[in-house]
């Protein structure tokens, strides 16, 4: 699996217009793209626009670049500056409940972007930490339904976790804080940046079954 994440600053008063543009224009324009597994967008708690798409592999994502560029061109008048995009293969992931195709229930999306690993560590070490420490810890929480980590470079990447609502995340804060603290002390160079927001715009094209998200690669 391969994920592309886009973050952007939006002109004042344009956020709802931008989200409606994604819902009514971008998502329909992506219909039928080979290898597209899902697409979603939201406004973050600090006022940024955040969108992400999930693909079967990098080749499928690359084949969609014309559609992506057309979507970006249509959004530029609503943006304050050129958006920041990052992408990479999913190197760790888990679903805790079935996420069905065409599921469109609102949820809380939380993305975490690291600044890089400590000397002598790589993002593969981060992936192992996510798989063996973070995901088992999340099993004790209520309201989480998916988590993953994507490698953008030898020492860089981003992770995400999806929750039923804001309350679920706040109740899980002790667990989240503990795993972040462990990551900072053992793996990453400094505390990562978190972006989160309630997502009402989502389109899944496949079921995401309970278990390892990376199994969808096989």
Show the residue positions of the predicted features:
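Short S/T/G/P-rich N-terminal loop/turn motif that feeds into the first structured element of a domain
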Residues: 1-50, 54-158, 162-218
């Amino acid at each position: 699996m391969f994920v592309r994440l886009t973050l952007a600053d939006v002109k004042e008063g344009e956020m709802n217009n931008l989200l409606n543009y994604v819902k009514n224009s971008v998502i329909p324009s992506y219909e039928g793209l080979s290898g597209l597994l899902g697409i979603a967008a939201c406004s973050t708690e600090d006022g940024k626009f955040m969108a992400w798409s999930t693909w079967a592999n990098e080749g499928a994502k690359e084949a969609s670049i014309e559609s992506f560029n057309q979507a970006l061109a249509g959004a530029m008048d609503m943006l304050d500056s050129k958006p920041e995009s990052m992408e990479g293969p999913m190197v760790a992931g888990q679903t805790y409940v079935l996420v069905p195709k065409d599921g469109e229930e609102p949820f809380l999306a939380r993305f975490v972007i690291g600044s890089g690993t400590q000397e002598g560590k790589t993002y593969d070490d981060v992936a192992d930490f996510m798989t063996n420490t973070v995901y088992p810890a999340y099993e004790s929480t209520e309201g989480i339904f998916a988590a993953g980590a994507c490698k953008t470079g030898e020492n860089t990447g981003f992770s995400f976790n999806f929750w039923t609502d804001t309350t679920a995340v706040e109740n899980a804060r002790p667990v989240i804080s503990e795993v972040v603290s462990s990551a900072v002390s053992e793996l990453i160079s400094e505390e990562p940046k978190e972006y989160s927001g309630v997502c009402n715009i989502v389109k899944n094209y496949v079921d995401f079954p309970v278990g390892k998200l990376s199994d969808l690669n096989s």
